[in-house]
Amino acid sequence: MAAPGTVASVMASKTKTKKKHFVVQKVKLFRASDPLLSVLMWGVNHSINELSHVQIPVMLMPDDFKAYSKIKVDNHLFNKENMPSHFKFKEYCPMVFRNLRERFGIDDQDFQNSLTRSAPLANDSQARSGARFHTSYDKRYIIKTITSEDVAEMHNILKKYHQFIVECHGNTLLPQFLGMYRLTVDGVEIYMIVTRNVFSHRLSVYRKYDLKGSTVAREASDKEKAKELPTFKDNDFINDGQKIHIDENNKRMFLEKLKKDVEFLAQLKLMDYSLLVGIHDVERAEQEEVECEENDGEDEGESDGTHPIGTPPDSPGNTLNSSLPLAPGEFDPAIDVYGIKSHESAPRKEVYFMAIIDILTHYDAKKKAAHAAKTVKHGAGAEISTVNPEQYSKRFLDFIANILT
């Protein structure tokens, strides 16, 4: 029986002919409650399989930063319970993102497994922009919906971002961009980007902050506070009397890294980014584990094995190799790359997970207008968030340096 199409993808820059390729579904099933997630799982699986046949180049070429692979799928009646009948999947700059994954120490096979073995899990977090978040089932990666403007901005900065990652050997607090995709289902286009989770894949976070170094309108709303794991902000952090208790060596290394990252963002005229902070309380987690085990004893067979506290949106989660027994408060730094333990004399034994998020806001005319309007409303000296990129970076660094103790 002749196959109606061939499995192929176009890895070519936009200057080349855009050929559409039609594929037949293979027997691997991608079950997800949301058809878009099924398409994402299918697409990532297809993309990694295709890339495995493409030789790794000695160096990336300028065209790699404009390239894409694009595929159209006609499902007909196969697996129609799980997949839409017709969809398109586009991956941007596949060779560049493969190179970035390698530089961040992420194996493509592991990446593929994390995103396709089981459906990503929805987070209750929603950005002000309306972006939705999902976490890979093993909590290692975050999938975020983005706008076409974000895709354009990623293309604008990708070459410089890649160069920066090469120069710092992947040792950065910037988001680790691992793949960018466009999914088309029923004529609707959705853009998604995958990053490494900031938070731990196994240590639960009980308190979460999004810090910008600004104090105007920087409190969590009542609606946000009602969530299981709210995202608190700068004024909440100050009012809680919160501090990050890390030793001098960790503090020095963290601030050096942060300074380089933020200077890079200022050069690119990027702003409005945040430091995402997640706090794991070691004693609290131990206590909850004891209670969990006691409950498991009473309700044997009913537990789903999940932690009582969920993992926040912009972070990592349950791993493929979690078989290694780790002591309370311990983590694998190869996976939980952002983790820092509290110092010996800290009031509580904690682990902090901290990294920069949301870097794709460019200081353009819209931001300048917002700055002017807020200055009129709050006064020139107010700590508003829409200052220029140089001011933003300085204020951000000063604020973060002051909360480390």
Swiss-Prot record:
PIPK domain location is 32-404
The keyword Ubl conjugation appears for this protein = no
SMART domains the record matches: PIPKc
- Give the source species: Gallus gallus
Q: What class of enzyme is it?
A: transferase
- Where on the tree of life does the source sit, at the highest rank? Eukaryota
Name of the encoding gene: PIP4K2A
Q: What is this protein called?
A: Phosphatidylinositol 5-phosphate 4-kinase type-2 alpha
* Record text on subunit structure and interactions: Homodimer.
Which SUPFAM superfamilies does this one have?
SAICAR synthase-like
* PTM characteristics: Phosphorylated in tyrosines. Phosphorylation is induced by light and increases kinase activity.
Example of a GO cellular component annotation carried by this entry: lysosome
Q: Which UniProt keywords apply?
A: ATP-binding, Cell membrane, Cytoplasm, Kinase, Lipid metabolism, Lysosome, Membrane, Nucleotide-binding, Nucleus, Transferase
